[in-house]
Amino acid sequence: MYKVILHKNAAKYYRNADKKLQGRINTAIDIILENPRYHVHIKKLEGELKDMVRYRLGNLRILYEIHENVKTVRIKAIEARGSVYK
């Protein structure tokens, strides 16, 4: 299983989210940690973000990088769909 590292921006979004949303994010992170590459809500990004993967959580997107050599998932952003890719 992978370990998770939250980037400061992702951690800030998580801290400011209400408890219900935090629970949904926790569930999504558990799914990501089980298998960070394959799930119905997981997609590898293209273009400038080609090293990133996204998890779709309703209107939110969780963007992360996978580091296979140390079995780590680094979550870079948790934001609304419209602003996360900017």
Predicted features by range, described:
Residues 1-8, 16-23, 39, 57-60, ...:
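Enriched for short, Lys/Arg-rich terminal
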Residues 30-54:
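A short, surface-exposed loop/turn module that caps and links secondary-structure elements
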